[in-house]
């Protein structure tokens, strides 16, 4: 019989977390599946030292945001709703229109919906970098290719 009192739950300290940079090419990927994988890495759930209340996640760079795919008829039917809090200030945008104007916003909104909506979630979201096209200014961080099915 082992002494179970000697086992302690590991809790990561913010100073001892080692962060890596990952890069993902969004070309031909399905939006929801890509966003859930990105959210996992941003949160740090892919690491053994995951601690729910500490930011243990890594940085993620997404390129080719304009070439993201959506399953089914979502390209025509999915809408984004916003309101300016003024009378008549409702704004409803179609995904197709948003992809043409600001393709980065589609991926950012999908990932934000999968992160916690609190101070930690806002801190995690700052580690997501989304770019239109293949160019990005983070070559100095030596990002590693992230496999997303």
UniProtKB/Swiss-Prot annotation:
Entry keyword Ion transport: no
The entry's keywords: Ribonucleoprotein, Ribosomal protein
GO biological process, one term: translation
One annotated GO molecular function: mRNA binding
Alphabetized InterPro entries for the sequence: Ribosomal_uL13, Ribosomal_uL13_bac-type, Ribosomal_uL13_sf
Gene Ontology CC annotations of this record: cytosolic large ribosomal subunit
CDD domains assigned to the protein according to its UniProt record, in alphabetical order: Ribosomal_L13
Gene3D superfamilies (UniProt xref): Ribosomal protein L13
Subunit structure of this chain's protein: Part of the 50S ribosomal subunit.
Role summary: This protein is one of the early assembly proteins of the 50S ribosomal subunit, although it is not seen to bind rRNA by itself. It is important during the early stages of 50S assembly.
Similarity annotation: Belongs to the universal ribosomal protein uL13 family.
Name of the protein: Large ribosomal subunit protein uL13
Source organism of the structure: Prosthecochloris aestuarii (strain DSM 271 / SK 413)
Species lineage: Bacteria, Pseudomonadati, Chlorobiota, Chlorobiia, Chlorobiales
Gene assigned in the entry: rplM
């Amino acid at each position: 019989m082992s002494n179970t009192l000697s086992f302690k739950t590991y809790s990561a300290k913010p100073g001892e977390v080692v962060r890596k940079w990952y890069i993902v090419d969004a070309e031909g990927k399905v939006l929801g599946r890509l966003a859930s994988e990105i959210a996992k890495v941003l949160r740090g759930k892919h690491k053994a030292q995951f601690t729910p209340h500490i930011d243990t996640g890594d940085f993620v760079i997404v390129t080719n945001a304009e070439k993201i795919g959506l399953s089914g008829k979502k390209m025509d039917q999915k809408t984004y709703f916003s309101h300016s809090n003024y009378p008549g200030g409702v704004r409803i945008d179609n995904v197709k229109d948003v992809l043409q104007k600001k393709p980065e916003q589609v991926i950012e909104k999908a990932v934000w919906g999968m992160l916690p909506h609190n101070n930690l979630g806002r801190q995690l979201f700052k580690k997501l970098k989304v770019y239109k096209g293949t160019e990005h200014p983070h070559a100095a961080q030596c990002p590693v290719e992230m496999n997303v099915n």
